[in-house]
Amino acid sequence: MKKTFSAFLALLIIVSTAVTASERADVDPKILSAFQKEFSFATNAKWEVKGNLTQVNFLLNDQGVIAWYNSDAELVTTARNILYNQLPISVIRTLEKEYAGADFSGITEVNRNNETYYQIRADEKSKKYLLKASPSGNIIVLKKIK
């Protein structure tokens, strides 16, 4: 029984290593190096090449993050889900004023080109919006969902 379990465990380790290696097989080594420098404490990295961009989903301090790199191994964008109470106070004040009574969900903090903004889904009684908010509280409607 112990030999069977040991053999199974060894096979599992080999398969896991092969899967990890194959997940990185298509990723440019420059991008892997840039990622390891930028996010040295990241865990559970999952890679996907999408056209000219390479996307990596990973955990950083137990929080899910997505990052995109261009073909020059430059970090283009990062995104992570956050809670309503993690929004800047100026954004919360504007949301409470302009969308009083709405439910907010799907809140994502995005960093792109040295700019931070927040994408927020606002559900009112009969309307749904995808909003974009700047840290200063300026909000625009990106899309009316219903």
Put a short name on every predicted segment:
Residues 1-25, 35:
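Bacterial Sec-dependent N-terminal signal peptides
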Residues 22-146:
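Interaction-mediating elements
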